[in-house]
Amino acid sequence: MKILLVSSGSGSRGGGEIFLKYLAEGLTERRHQVLMWLPSHPRMDELAVRCARFAHIIRADYRNTYDYWARSVSTCFNWGVSHRVAGAWKALRPDVIHINKQNLEDGLDLLRAARCCGVPSVCTIHLTHTASYLRAKAAWLRDQIARWQLSRYSGVLVAVQDGRCRVLRELLAGRAYTKTILNGVPRVDAVALHALRKAKRKELGLADSDFVVLGLGRLVEQKQPFLFLRMAKELYKQCPRAKFLWVGDGVLAKQWERAVAREKLDGVVSCAGWQGDVLPFLFAGDLLLHVAKFEGLPLALIEAMAAGLPCAVTRDFSSEIPFFNEENILFVDDVQDLVEKIGNPLVLRSVAGAGRRLVEEKLSVHNMARSYEQLYLDVIESATRSMSLSSG
């Protein structure tokens, strides 16, 4: 198949865009021709470079929803943009178009473009939380606009886990086709893990006895880096050999540095900034502490599981993922219980092993690419059948 993957252009470093990279790789390995349509904004340059070796990159003049002051209210009326984009997509003659959106209101003009060009399409939405849930400005109006545009979309709307798909169905009251396809990450070579772990820990100046707790993600409110900091302070009191390392950058970086200094955690808590390759850090760590406020199915978490790292999350988050349980995940809600498990190597090895098996069985790039491949075939067949009926 000739597959056109479309980014709404929110950036190169978020999980949603890394998902697009993994999917493109997986589809290429399955011998499909992958085209990747990326907005020409400089923030997309990094993703374009990383994907150029396995996909044909197309840069286009397109403005992301969050580059408009009025957000989705602005994209609600930009029919000219949608028609221009539709014409460009149609000229590429893809068999199927796959639009990748961060949230409900992001890229609604791209869904309109898909309707206009008539090519079979699907759309992945990573976060299906409403603007009202997020307490955004003009939330009611923005939710109404998103509901209206999503309900008019004739393709399949894909959520990345069942809980998010259920919310999407309820929001649209059954007026759109919805489906769950789980995110996937590449397989990690277990043999390479041990050699790279030793080298990375030496580079970071870590002692063999240090227990390294990682945070992974952008330094933004959604990821709750200051909750990570509070957890670090509490865990350090009870586990003095613990060291805490945040891997990522963002708008809260300066505030984070001041908070570390204010809490006198220099030498205990540090930040590695943005890293193009997080795998060596995952190898060097002993635990991933994931405390984000809201998520879809975070790639950081399943990348850590694939690398054999035990992971700790909130019970609220784990309740949305039915295959997360006490065998393959730890919980941050009870600090004393977490401290006891941190001190038990047998428990950590068991949880890490179960997490790694979970990724291999359910959350691999291979499984994700195969599931999307089948969905593409289904929407192409459905479109062909509809054309036959209308012409008959």
What residues fall within each predicted segment?
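An aromatic- and histidine-rich active-site surface loop
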Residues: 81-82, 97-117
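Conserved acidic donor-binding segment of nucleotide-sugar-dependent glycosyltransferases
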Residues: 324-336, 343-346
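A short, well-ordered alpha-helix in the C-terminal region of glycosyltransferases
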Residues: 347-362, 368-374
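Short hydrophobic beta-strand element within catalytic cores of glycosyltransferases
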Residues: 310-314
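A short, active-site helix/loop in glycosyltransferases that binds the activated sugar's phosphate group
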Residues: 151-180, 185-187, 321
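Nucleotide-activated donor-binding/catalytic signature segment of Leloir-type glycosyltransferases, i.e.
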Residues: 257-273
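A conserved mid-protein helix/loop that constitutes part of the nucleotide-sugar donor-binding site
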Residues: 14-25, 211-234, 251-257
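Aromatic "clamp/platform" in nucleotide-sugar-dependent glycosyltransferases that forms part
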Residues: 102, 274, 293
